[in-house]
């Protein structure tokens, strides 16, 4: 189930994004990005609709994933 990020408290959203960034360990290429830059990049992607917040009822977890992947059914078991 997609969770509307706009309805979350800003501090809660920041914590969710930070947790995701730290958990994912995303590679940003040759130049290393700070945590703040990575968080801002994910926030930008949420605002543009590139990624969505997804709640898994099965696992009772929240994840951030590309909208295309969610729409294609790649969200299972989310």
Swiss-Prot record:
Family according to the record: Belongs to the UPF0270 family.
Gene3D superfamilies per UniProt: YehU-like
Pfam families: UPF0270
UniProt-recorded name of the protein: UPF0270 protein PC1_3850
Matching NCBIfam families: PRK04966.1
Lineage: Bacteria, Pseudomonadati, Pseudomonadota, Gammaproteobacteria, Enterobacterales
The organism of origin for this protein: Pectobacterium carotovorum subsp. carotovorum (strain PC1)
């Amino acid at each position: 189930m997609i969770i509307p990020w706009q309805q979350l408290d800003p501090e809660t959203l920041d914590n969710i994004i930070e947790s995701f960034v730290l958990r994912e360990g995303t590679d940003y290429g040759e130049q290393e990005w700070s945590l703040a830059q990575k968080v801002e990049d994910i926030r930008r992607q949420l605002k543009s609709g590139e990624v969505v917040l997804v709640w898994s009822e099965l696992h009772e977890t929240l994840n951030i994933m590309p909208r295309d992947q969610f729409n294609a059914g790649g969200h299972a078991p989310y």
